Amino acid sequence: MALHQSNIIINILLVSAFLLNLVFAFIIIFMERRTANSIWAWLLVLVFLPLVGFILYLLLGRQIQREHIFKLAKEDKVGLEMIVDEQLEALKKQDFSKGNHQIVKFKEMVQMLLYNNAAFLTTDNDLTIYTDGHQKFDDLINDIRHAQSYIHIQYYIIHSDNLGKQLLHELEKKAEEGIEVKMLYDDMGSRDLRKKDLKKFRQKGGHAESFFPSKLPLINLRMNNRNHRKIVVIDGTIGYVGGFNVGDEYIGKSKKFGYWRDTHLRIKGDAVNALQLRFILDWNSQSTRDNLTYESRYFPDVDSGGTIGIQIASSGPDEDWEQIKYGYLKMISSAKESIYIQSPYFIPDQAFLDSIKIAALGGVDVNIMVPNKRDHPFVYWATLKNVASLLEAGVNVYHYDNGFLHSKTLVIDDEVASVGTANMDNRSFTLNFEVNAFIYDEGVARSLKQAFINDMKLSNKLTSEEYAKRNLLVKFKEGISQLLSPIL
């Protein structure tokens, strides 16, 4: 009798799992915006892992309802629509460049980012490029110490290690001085940020919010959609954006990764207003009691003395368009002479890969650099498979060997560049919340290109002959990783 009841229970569980898989399969195919590759990948997971497939889907596969995010993010747009309309009209009249040759030459790209992302163009910026974590954090801490009104700081990862505690200590001192300090961190990325450190930060007068916190113990049903942005705005006059997170490993103190090679920007000029707007929207999406409203001090007029053109573009699962991806594609298709790409994870879709092949086959000098260290095994092998597929088209591929390469940069024709948080993979393009600076300036483009060339001396060039010698186990790892790449 007991055995019969056990069999009934098992059968009920199996039927329930099967029905759940059918429901999720229906949702994936008919109700969510997905690529064909992503649909097939999730269907394979649900079919071949019937007992755990729906759990994996709950954790990793659910898409955010865009309407929900729009409700979270509604905030006065501080005249944004008017600015965008004015700039689009100026583009039509050819009255837009203020002497910037790159803006005239790449006006279609400027228009695309304006139209799709409301990424208004600023032309009076000055910036500093960082490729080393020590330099970046030395300057950031110095800027924090000189803050007069407020500090808005947002990172995907903040660790409770030496660097993390040092940064929190500097922020706490400013909060005690009466400076407004607001810190937004990602709940998953900053899971090692200790509660006692946050408690102390708040006791000192700081305000902290986590992005998409878990409502259940030990599990976060929105773990697949993370805020990967790294933004700092100080007094509305200085802004930071780029790839560095906060932790000892990002200044080269990790035994696993060694030296951490990244790219980050310090901006002075009106582009800081765009970073400020992005921070306010993100902050208000998570804060229920301490919303930021439009104040003139948050958007001051800044006389940086600079002449660099910048658009700040953001993307995320709340958007209808993959704006940063489109920006990358527009840059690649516009290149006439050279393309330089650095990305720790290189798992774009086939159309993206084809755009790179087309550029290379058309005579453009295409160079891609990826790390030779394995941050995430499946991602590493999928990246290797993708970059190797470009070799026969004439693309130059380099494996960075001097630690871990985390830089996300794209430079074309010594004229236009992009630096930010978005990797060249499906996760950054469609799942995570990202932010990039698109920069129209020869000097900046050449500096980033030179940084790439310097890194070549610390890298190994991958050849078709070398790649062909890989063993059966490597081929198997690549195959499995490639199959899973749409959901990595």
From Swiss-Prot:
SUPFAM superfamilies: Phospholipase D/nuclease (SSF56024). SMART domains: PLDc. The keyword Transferase applies. Its EC number is 2.7.8.-. The keyword Transmembrane helix applies. Residues 223-250, 401-428 form the PLD phosphodiesterase domain. It holds the Pfam family PLDc_2. It is a multi-pass membrane protein. Disulfide bonds: none annotated. InterPro entries: Cardiolipin_synth_Firmi, Cardiolipin_synthase, CLS_N, PLD-like_dom, PLipase_D/transphosphatidylase. GO terms for cellular component: plasma membrane. GO terms for biological process: cardiolipin biosynthetic process. The active site is at H228, K230, D235, H406, K408, D413. It is found in: Cell membrane. One of its GO terms (molecular function) is cardiolipin synthase activity. Keywords: Cell membrane, Lipid biosynthesis, Lipid metabolism, Membrane, Phospholipid biosynthesis, Phospholipid metabolism, Repeat, Transferase, Transmembrane, Transmembrane helix. Belongs to the phospholipase D family. Cardiolipin synthase subfamily. Catalyzes the reversible phosphatidyl group transfer from one phosphatidylglycerol molecule to another to form cardiolipin (CL) (diphosphatidylglycerol) and glycerol. HAMAP family: Cardiolipin_synth_Cls. This is Cardiolipin synthase 2. The gene is cls2.
